[in-house]
Regions:
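Residues at the starts of beta-strands that form the adenosine-phosphate
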Residues: 28-31, 76, 113, 152
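Short secondary-structure boundary segments
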Residues: 7, 36, 82-83, 118
């Protein structure tokens, strides 16, 4: 099963994804693939908050760029947190659009159950600079790619999860 949970920043996506993946794991430790690179103190604090909430319930893998490689032969379930930060990393490291889309295609081919967490960035204004527009456009393409293939798609707003597929 492949599940997408999308929503705004601090909307409750991660909490819902963590609860769901634990249910899917049937008592085993699910894999938590963390994609964030610790580039500033504020981001470090966000990551620490996530680590505290997770505790010892997950097997954590930290990989900011090569997600499929980190998950090869994995016997899920896997929670990927989050594709928005991964996309940020990919653009920062100047991965081509083709490589970005191919990575998502490969993640969708994983045999194990996967929950993808991604911020919904397409509800605001069109950004005023090229890099921000590229980020928003690619994020939207990734969301569509996942939405088409995932068995279930959920939108989280104000801590409330709504299934939309």
């Amino acid at each position: 099963m492949k599940i997408l949970i999308t929503g705004g920043v601090k909307s409750g996506k991660s909490r819902h994804a963590e609860t769901r993946i634990l249910e899917m794991a049937n008592g085993k430790k699910p894999v938590y693939l963390a994609t964030t690179e610790l580039l500033d103190p504020e981001m470090e604090e966000r990551v620490l908050e996530h680590r505290r909430r997770r505790g010892e319930k997950f097997r954590t893998i930290e990989e900011p760029l090569h997600l499929t490689d980190a998950l090869l032969n994995m016997e899920g379930p896997v929670l990927i947190e989050c594709l928005t930060m991964w996309l940020n990393n990919a653009l920062h490291h100047q991965l081509s659009e083709k490589k970005i889309i191919t990575e998502i295609e490969n993640l969708l081919l994983l045999k194990c159950d996967v929950i993808f967490v991604q911020n919904e960035v397409g509800l605001g204004i069109i950004p005023d600079n090229l890099l921000a527009r590229k980020f928003a456009d690619l994020s939207g393409r990734i969301a569509q790619q996942l939405g088409e293939v995932c068995d279930e798609v959920n939108l989280c707003a104000a801590g409330i999860l709504v299934q939309i597929k």
